[in-house]
Amino acid sequence: MLPTGIIRPPAELELLNHLAAAFITRQAVGDYAPGAPLAAAVEKVHVLDFPSLVPPAAVPNHAADSKNRCVFCGSLYPGLREPGFALELFRALGPASGWPLTMAGGGWQYFAADAAQTKAVLGEQFEQPGPVPAETARTMQAQADVLLNLGNAVANQLPSKLFDYFAAGKPVLHLCVIENDPALPYLARYPLALVLHQGQADAADILHRWLGEVCGKQLPFGEVCDLFPELVPQAVAAEFVRWLM
């Protein structure tokens, strides 16, 4: 399966010339359109969604304390995935909301001023553990009440993390910073999702109400698979067989 993002036409075309077929995500289709860098290989590629719906790891579901938790685990990048909208929302909620925000991962050196401002407002309710091992991240996400997804600022990259969130069955808060966010069609099919758009005047009020409504809710994995039947491993394997046999 070929990635989206940075396109290196000579190298990718050479690779495609040696393949019988290749699978691409929907976000990469434009790279093979007439006049696009990889148009010459359009007959070789087939669209396949993320094959990412697998049962979450068995870890404790709740932390020792009774705090509500909103958790993000991932790296931050200027111009691609920034924390500003999330920090603005949780500053607006304030410490009285009772919702700590935990954002684990690297990249905070680019957003130190915004983080410091948030820490001044939220105090201990804003946690930055830094980069954590994958096992720790899985535990943090399993113990979260709400999972935070930061929408990318480009339309040709869809965070695979989103499908891990769906598989966990937890409420998902998605913060959208572009109109053509590629995650939106998937989020529209997930009943425990809230999408907020940057610049939305009443975003903090909507978030406050939603947090109260979804806290403690969780979808069984089987129900999530029914929502996204094309994303389960069996469906993906069937597509491989259909195109390669």
Question: Could you describe each region identified by the protein language model?
Answer:
Residues M1-G5:
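Active-site proximal beta-strand in glycosyltransferases
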Residues I6-V45:
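A short, active-site helix/loop in glycosyltransferases that binds the activated sugar's phosphate group
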Residues F23, H62-R81, F90-R91:
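Conserved donor-binding/catalytic core segment of Leloir-type glycosyltransferases
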Residues T25, F72-S75, A104, P129:
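Short hydrophobic "strand-cap" motifs at the C-terminus of beta-strands
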Residues T102-G107, A112-T136:
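Nucleotide-activated donor-binding/catalytic signature segment of Leloir-type glycosyltransferases, i.e.
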Residues L38-V42, V54-V71, L93-A96:
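Nucleotide-sugar donor-binding and catalytic loop/hinge architecture
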Residues A142-E230:
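Catalytic binding pocket for nucleotide-activated donors in carbohydrate/polymer assembly enzymes
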Residues A28, F50-P51:
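Carbohydrate-associated surface elements
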